[in-house]
Regions:
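N-terminal secretory signal peptides that target proteins for export/translocation
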Residues: 1-5
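Bacterial N-terminal signal peptides
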Residues: 6-18
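Boundary at the C-terminal end of the N-terminal hydrophobic targeting segment
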Residues: 21-23
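Short, glycine-/small- and polar/acidic-enriched structural segments
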Residues: 26-97
Length: 97
């Protein structure tokens, strides 16, 4: 194998590995309730299903118990792009525009 072929093989190996590394995406999901609460359990199951159905291209990491944002801050955090996804009762958003 001459030097040009070796360089081409190395180049394509780097490109393929770089593409694979950047194709997976991770989202943080803010949850107000503790991990044992059924809302958080449902969110965890949802996150698992998303990862399975997307073939691992999208992984959602749940943050229960207000560990990422407190309940009253979740809507603002998602709205402003600080968190990609969050769970909050719709009735708590009654005064939001």
């Amino acid at each position: 194998m001459n030097i040009i072929n070796k360089i081409l093989v190395l180049f394509f190996a780097i490109i393929l590995n770089t593409n694979t590394a950047f194709s997976a995406e991770k989202w943080d999901m803010a949850l107000a309730y503790g991990a044992s609460n059924f809302h958080s359990a449902n969110a965890t199951e949802f996150a698992k299903n998303v990862s399975d159905k997307s073939g691992g291209k999208l992984t959602i990491v749940t943050h229960p118990g207000g560990s990422l944002y407190k309940g009253g801050e979740i809507f603002r955090a998602v709205r402003t792009g600080q968190a990609q996804i969050g769970e909050r009762f719709m009735s708590a958003l009654g005064k939001e525009d």
